[in-house]
Amino acid sequence: MNLKKQLACIYTNNFFSGLRITDAVWVALLAARGFSLWEIGVAESVFHMVSLTFEVPSGMAADLLGRKKTLVAGGVCMVLSNLLMAFAPDLFFICLAMALSALANAMFSGTASALTYDSLKQCGRTDDYLRVSANCSQLSMLATAVGSLASTLERFLRFSGFYLLSAAFEGTAAAATALMTEPIVTETQARREKQTFRDLPGQLARLVRDSITALRATPLAAKLIVSAAVLCIPSYLTKMFVQQRLVELGWPTALLFVPMLLSGLASMLGVEAGRRLHPESLRRFYAVCALLCGGGCALVGAAPVLGCIFGCMLVQGVIDAYLLHEDQKLNDVIPSDQRATLISVDSMVYSLLMIPASPLVGAVGDAFGQAGAGLAVLGVLVALTGTAALGRKTRAS
């Protein structure tokens, strides 16, 4: 394998897939079209229900059929999702587009990390994973920050224009994926090209058994998965509802890129800080991160404009610092043949929590007449998990 070319393709994919220019404005655009926060929450719940359904199957497909093929298929789904969203006439088609996007993200999650880790493993460079992972994260965040500037083009692009441009970026990311090389680090992976469809049921059954055995043998993996899922809830929902929250406070829609840009900068700084941190106890590290994330989420929900923006930055920076170490530790403790499957369990648990969380946060906001009310409640709950972790005597390293 040409590792230099492989990493170039991985970095290119991370950048263009991160240019999701709709992330900064989609809630505000849908609200401007007459959709309530509850309806937007329903669409988001559809996303997470589909994600929950296909997270583990997509990881299994990646382990059985190949990580590269799965990533390319996900890129195609992402392009179709953006095209459908561009011309969606009602909530049903909005939900259908969200379902396609969720299917694509299910294919990406776990698979991209597994391909990157095993590419380094094939070349005997697993010690470089933290650095490469940090580079990927920072490229994605840089792309997200650049993409957030698209909110300044609202009067020119309109609703459909945002999604058509996003489809072009996703197509470029899929093309970069197609140029990658499938990493081979085990005998099972080497036999992929020779296996027939008749072999797949038996291979699938073996993969399920081996994955369950791996989870039982490594309780630390389960703890890492749950901790990441809990922290990712405020990470996404603050970005989702801060848009409407700022509009309520008088912030112009054309300037919604500013908090998104600053949040992206905070994420990059968080990754850089995480790269330099070496926590002795992941339990204590989680506790501190949960307290900070909870506090930041509460600020987004209850503070005035500057406090709201600072809270969003705090949440994004802290969670990315934690996820960098969680991702490396999880990859270190799970086997290569089940890597994509087990990392997909990580995303599945997140989706399982997001299905009720998204509409509930929106419903609380509708009930109180303020988009931030639900975020304030969520922030308190997340902070309580950090307090509970600090209260336990057992340490997880």
Predicted regions mapped to residue ranges:
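Juxtamembrane intracellular "pre-TM" segments in multi-pass secondary transporters
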Residues: 1-4, 181-225
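C-terminal ends and interior cores of transmembrane alpha-helices
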Residues: 76-90, 291-304
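Helix-loop boundary and gating motifs at the non-cytosolic
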Residues: 1-53, 218-261
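Conserved MFS/SLC helix-loop-helix module at the cytosolic interface between two early adjacent transmembrane helices
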Residues: 52-89
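C-terminal transmembrane bundle of multi-pass solute transporters/carriers
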Residues: 44, 68, 240-397
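Cytoplasmic helix-loop-helix junction between adjacent transmembrane helices
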Residues: 99-141
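Helix-loop junctions on the cytosolic side of multi-pass membrane transporters
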Residues: 166-195, 390-397
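Loop-to-transmembrane helix entry/capping segments in MFS-fold secondary transporters
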Residues: 37-38, 123-136, 253, 334-346
